[in-house]
Amino acid sequence: MMIHGFQSSHRDFCFGPWKLTASKTHIMKSADVEKLADELHMPSLPEMMFGDNVLRIQHGSGFGIEFNATDALRCVNNYQGMLKVACAEEWQESRTEGEHSKEVIKPYDWTYTTDYKGTLLGESLKLKVVPTTDHIDTEKLKAREQIKFFEEVLLFEDELHDHGVSSLSVKIRVMPSSFFLLLRFFLRIDGVLIRMNDTRLYHEADKTYMLREYTSRESKISSLMHVPPSLFTEPNEISQYLPIKEAVCEKLIFPERIDPNPADSQKSTQVE
């Protein structure tokens, strides 16, 4: 679980034609949470919902990508009821008490699992998403480079009635000639499973595209008996033990025509 600092902050950083923005503030007020839950057709939202937190990468011409909690929750699949109920029943069996069955078996994804990969920005100009076989060069990322800018933003977190954690956070680091972003959804249901959905975004200053890699990993706790339980709460450590269930590599290609006179950009609603 992340350590929460509730001091609001807003930071901007310029990387060539790009403006990187990280905004962090308090959790949403209960009235706003209820309104959003109705809009998303969900009976409840994560107990710590940072609806105004955002990490944005925007070109001077208006196109770009951002990461926010509301759009992430739009990608929660509330219709895979059988899978969720099966998981809830297994969780129920792992508990010594019996009063939790009604609590966890609900007609929505109470784990808030999301395959959100970001929200594309721009109106007339937009990043074009195309499949690719190219991968992010992890060796380049291991090179010791000066970190010009770093920020981490928590989007939501829920402790699943003290029986685990469901969280979504995004962090970015900027080097002299590139930037790298990691959006991570992490789910741990005590005694049942661990799931991790990662979106990595990488851009080198001399390229006309970003590389985006999405991986979904998951394992039942019963398959992790060889792993020290202390690692179950450490996403960076446990990830190597979680089998990959899905992997998607994409290029986010810049528009061919870049507006020489960037106008005020409008945020779109295209969620990836």
UniProtKB/Swiss-Prot annotation:
Changing M196V: Abolishes interaction with PPP2CA, PPP2CB and PPP4C. The modification Phosphoserine is found at S265. The modification N6-acetyllysine is found at K106. Keywords: Acetylation, Cytoplasm, Phosphoprotein. One of its GO terms (cellular component) is cytosol. It is found in: Cytoplasm. It comes from Homo sapiens. Transmembrane segments: none annotated. Belongs to the TIP41 family. One of its GO terms (biological process) is TOR signaling. Isoform 1 interacts with PPP2CA. Isoform 2 does not interact with PPP2CA. Interacts with PPP2CB, PPP4C and PPP6C. Interacts with IGBP1; the interaction is dependent on PPP2CA. Associates with a protein phosphatase 2A PP2A(C):IGBP1 complex. Interacts with PPP4C and PPP4R2. InterPro entries: Phosphatase_reg/MetRdx, TIP41-like. The lineage of its organism: Eukaryota, Metazoa, Chordata, Craniata, Vertebrata. This is TIP41-like protein.
